[in-house]
Amino acid sequence: MSCVHNNTSFPVQIEAYLKEVFEKYKELQESKDTSLTARFARVLKYYQFLIYSAFSDPKFGIGQGENTRGLLIYHQMGMGKTILSLSLAISLSHIYNPILIAPKSLHSNFQQSLLKLIKLLYPETTDHSKELQKISRRFRFVSLDAYNMGQQIIKAGGSLNGCLLIVDEAHNLFRGIINSANDKTNARQLYNNIMQAKNIRILFLTGTPCSKDPFEMVPCFNMLSGRILLPLHYERFYTAYVNKTTNSPLNADKLLNRLVGMISYAGNQNELNKLFPTELPLIIEKVEMSPEQYRQYLLARDVENAEKHASSGMYEKMNTAALCLPGSEQESGSSYYVRSRMISIFASEMLTVKEDEKLSEAVQQLPKEAFTENSSPKIACMLKNIKTSPGPVLIYSQFVELGLHVVARFLEIEGYQCLQPLKVLEEGHNTILLHKDGKDLMVKNFAEDEPTHTLVLSSKITRFTLITGKILSKERDMIQQLWNSPLNIHGEVIKILLVSKTGAEGLDLKYGRQVHILEPYWDKAREDQVKARIIRIGSHDALPPEEKTVQPFLYIAVANQKMFYSIPEGSQEQKTIDERFHERGLEKSHLNSAFRDLLKRAAIECAFNGESGCLMCQPTNALLFHENFERDLRLPNPCQPLVKTEVKAYSISYEGKQFFYQKNKEVGLGYTFYEYNPIIKAYIEIKPSNPLYIKLIKHVQAGTTV
């Protein structure tokens, strides 16, 4: 069976296909079959196996032939997108060259997941190194954040022709494309290379598509379709698909028609939700700035406003270029209110940065007296909340020097010890981690097949550590192993982990009980990504039921009330930058969430999972959309709702096949005929335009009914 996504029959065909795959999945799980497909059925979750089958089946067509080139794997964070993509890479590596594009910090995650997958696939093998080496040789890794990404791709395979391209954290690529002012950026060059590639299969992995703007969909689905499926210009896209008055999707039915067949979604099924810890309602701490902090904040705002005024008008007459967000030309030089946002976290008169001195060094040289509740009411509030946590705690800030490093100094003053790796040494199956107090820490590899764990640490000291973009991958992996150790269920080894945006990507953490987000961001999906580092499938399985909860906190700096009301009326900014970012994020989140709901409705598993609002059409084999999006908007919607009804009909046999018919005076020729469709396992109406229709009328009128 081959299915083409630009066809009204596609939705019912894919639903029927997935039902067959699911039955096969249940059979293979109980079998002793040693084929690769059977092995994957015993390893993968059912929702992973559905996509594995649909994508790898040469007869079905997802990502092949006249169909789309691949899928947006929109699976809730923590549901195993990495394992799914590696499974497909292994299965298809004899046909396509696997190329993984991901932030450099995530490459080791994929390599570790690959070893884990091989162990699960071949449990009868004791030495997995040969199989790992054999499979690893087929993989090529490219750093999404590298300045020479294009050269890495050429080195990896010469071109993207004939490759299976896996892009992890794909939302970063989509944003990079639409934030580019020209075609010279890495992201835009990759977009052009993908669009020009031949015989390419694509897997875009993300738990947060459409997180910045719905316009992110344009590069995503153009690359997946291999053509200009969605309009390249921001204004044309918004005119066609966004109702700015209601802040909601416009022409949603026509957009759904274009997207169907290119999305896999998994995330809100009840049986899956049971595997996650309970996320408690977000606690928003609105923290009043101290007088000195607010004074410095106002000075920073004056500077930012002056810079904004100086640059205003420079781009007013510039039309938005293709694949660009409005203002992306300016944003490359924008401060994004960095000064005022950092001061909202920490402000001290003692902080001075000398020429050629790094900000982090200046923070380290500050005396203990600089770290008080007055210099950072936010951090003081956060520390009080942390003391109530019964288990490990995750702290996030996008600011490292005046965010995480300041928090680290506060923690040290409070008596916490920083477990900071200086060197990681491999010794057989053991790993030695040298940290800054000079003592050796012996750690057994915490793999599932390693039953014993050796840890040399004082239980009297409460520890914290940091993961930022600058940390080496081996150190990052070791910190994750320590956090996930069965000996760290309640934070006995690492109580607090501080992470930046880059540092948080790809982390898979267990046991976490609190998440602290030190400042709001206008992209609420980022907050979800941070929480998803510890809210994952099975992450709290080792804890008793009453401890399987995660409490998130968000900290928002507000004006010092006494000083605010002393400012002449009309001169005050009514809301702080923190408040404005938070409110803008909520507003933007509403629109982005509505478009993510459309992606769920267009997902190939939607009807199979019994979701509501799924795109399901009468299987008339008509084109689902016109290639020209403007003309498509003017045409009637070819997707007529699929309605299943029982009718009384007569049976007729013609040329060895069974048909049914009704006498129907409302039809021009007086008959309605039905034929069996094996794909959807139901009878569908034969249209009068079908040549078979006239033949069946003559057959009935000749009196040969059965």
UniProtKB/Swiss-Prot annotation:
ATP binds at residues 75-82. It comes from the Viruses. Gene3D superfamilies: P-loop containing nucleotide triphosphate hydrolases (3.40.50.300), Tandem AAA-ATPase domain (3.40.50.10810). Induction: Expressed in the late phase of the viral replicative cycle. Pfam families: Helicase_C, SNF2-rel_dom. GO terms for molecular function: ATP binding; hydrolase activity; RNA helicase activity. Residues 417-599 form the Helicase C-terminal domain. Its main location: virion. Putative DNA-dependent ATPase required for providing the needed energy to achieve the termination of early transcripts. Belongs to the DEAD box helicase family. DEAH subfamily. PANTHER family: DNA ANNEALING HELICASE AND ENDONUCLEASE ZRANB3 FAMILY MEMBER, SWI_SNF-RELATED MATRIX-ASSOCIATED ACTIN-DEPENDENT REGULATOR OF CHROMATIN SUBFAMILY A-LIKE PROTEIN 1. This is Termination factor NPH-I homolog. It comes from African swine fever virus (isolate Tick/Malawi/Lil 20-1/1983).
